[in-house]
């Protein structure tokens, strides 16, 4: 889907986020997404990526559970919820798209192992897909409303 949806820089950031999104998982870490974002920033700098790619990867790693958490715990019909999610990706529609794709890939990779808590919370299904899509749409709408209201200059492609 790279040629249709993302330019090379955004696609690179998405792939790197996919590789690094769980880098913060280890014993005694309570928030592996935040821990992973700190590590991702260092890794991006050491690998010589430009500031934009490094920022996108850091945000995606930090927020890689957020869309699923919002979708299963908040009301997408509440405009404040869509706005809150939009702020997590700096109101950037491309970052929101990337977060959606990362969320789907991460959720789809989880098995339905009976004893595995993370599968119960984040595993993928048609039901979860519909919830995530509704929340994604709510955030996208929040960004669109702000653009039309003159708050930002964003190309929705």
Predicted ranges, named:
Residues 1-10, 16, 20, 24-31, ...:
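Divalent metal-dependent phosphate-bond-processing catalytic cores, especially two-metal-ion Mg2+/Mn2+ enzymes
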Residues 38, 59:
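DNA-binding alpha-helical recognition surfaces that contact promoter or target DNA
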Residues 50-58:
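Short, glycine/acidic-rich hinge or "gate" loops at secondary-structure transitions
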């Amino acid at each position: 889907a790279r040629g249709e949806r993302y330019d090379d820089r955004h696609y690179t950031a998405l792939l790197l986020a996919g590789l690094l999104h769980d880098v913060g998982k280890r014993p005694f870490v309570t928030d592996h997404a935040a821990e992973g974002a700190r590590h991702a920033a260092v890794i991006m700098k050491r690998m010589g990526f430009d500031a934009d790619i490094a920022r996108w990867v850091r945000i995606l790693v930090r927020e890689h559970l957020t869309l699923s958490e919002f979708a299963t715990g908040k009301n997408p019909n509440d405009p404040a919820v869509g706005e809150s999610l939009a702020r997590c990706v700096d109101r950037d529609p491309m970052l929101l798209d990337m977060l959606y794709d990362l969320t789907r890939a991460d959720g789809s990779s989880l098995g339905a192992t009976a004893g595995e808590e993370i599968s119960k919370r984040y595993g993928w299904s048609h039901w979860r897909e519909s919830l995530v899509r509704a929340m994604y749409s709510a955030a996208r709408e929040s960004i669109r409303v702000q653009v039309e209201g003159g708050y930002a200059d964003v190309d929705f492609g």
